[in-house]
Curated annotation (Swiss-Prot):
Its EC number is 4.2.1.19. Pathway: Amino-acid biosynthesis; L-histidine biosynthesis; L-histidine from 5-phospho-alpha-D-ribose 1-diphosphate: step 6/9. Pfam families: IGPD. The keyword Signal does not apply. SUPFAM superfamilies: Ribosomal protein S5 domain 2-like (SSF54211). GO terms for molecular function: imidazoleglycerol-phosphate dehydratase activity. This is Imidazoleglycerol-phosphate dehydratase. Keywords: Amino-acid biosynthesis, Cytoplasm, Histidine biosynthesis, Lyase. The keyword Cytoplasm applies. GO terms for biological process: L-histidine biosynthetic process.
Length: 197
């Protein structure tokens, strides 16, 4: 059974198309107009082994906030759609990823309940190119709200802002991959004692 999610979201501020195949090979086609964000979404697809298409046309003449936020909302909705009934998945996933001096620890529960815990080093450089580093938390908040997952992201240390953000996306990719993969020992079984996710 295909596990593909496709979401189109259009407002006065942005037009977003996201398509994700959870059982892909990591092929990506990303264009948001925000170079560093494209790089992070590429990491998400490649390291999650998700085939991921993202096309966003936003009001970048103002700034990148709406473009980044609306893309994350659509991505979360597409991920949730692709999960389907969640029967037979592992449900939980975690991964720790280093990037030189930085380290990210990510744990996810595909619980149907949105919750985010996010910590990263203080006093990071405020910008990476045109990317405002404070948007990383907002991306995660937006994704969690639509994907309906509990997500814990912890960066205990790091110096380089690029590395700090990138290792979060790589660890998120792997954690989502592990949680959404099918468990051969649980075929046909919903991973919940209450019978609903």
């Amino acid at each position: 059974m295909s596990r593909v999610g496709r979401v189109e979201r259009t407002t006065k501020e942005t037009s977003v198309l996201v398509e994700i195949d959870l059982d892909g090979t990591g092929k990506t086609d990303i264009a948001t107009g925000v170079g560093f964000y494209d790089h992070m979404l590429d990491q998400l697809g490649r390291h999650g082994l998700f085939d991921l298409t993202v096309k966003t046309d936003g009001d970048l003449h103002i700034d990148s906030h709406h473009t980044i936020e609306d893309t994350a909302l659509a991505l979360g909705a597409a991920f949730r759609q692709a999960l389907g009934d969640k029967v037979g998945i592992y449900r939980f996933g975690n991964c720790t990823v280093p990037l030189d001096e930085s380290l990210a620890q990510v744990t996810v529960d595909l619980s149907g309940r949105p919750y985010l815990v996010h910590t990263e080093p203080e006093n990071m450089a405020p910008m990476i190119g045109e990317y405002d580093v404070t948007m990383t938390r907002h991306i995660l908040e937006s994704f969690v709200a639509q994907a309906q997952v509990a997500l814990h992201v912890h960066v205990p240390y790091g110096r380089n802002a690029h590395h700090i953000v990138e290792c979060q996306f790589k660890a998120l990719a792997r954690a989502l991959r592990y949680a959404s993969e099918r468990d051969p020992r649980a075929a046909g079984i919903l991973p919940s004692t209450k019978g609903a996710l």
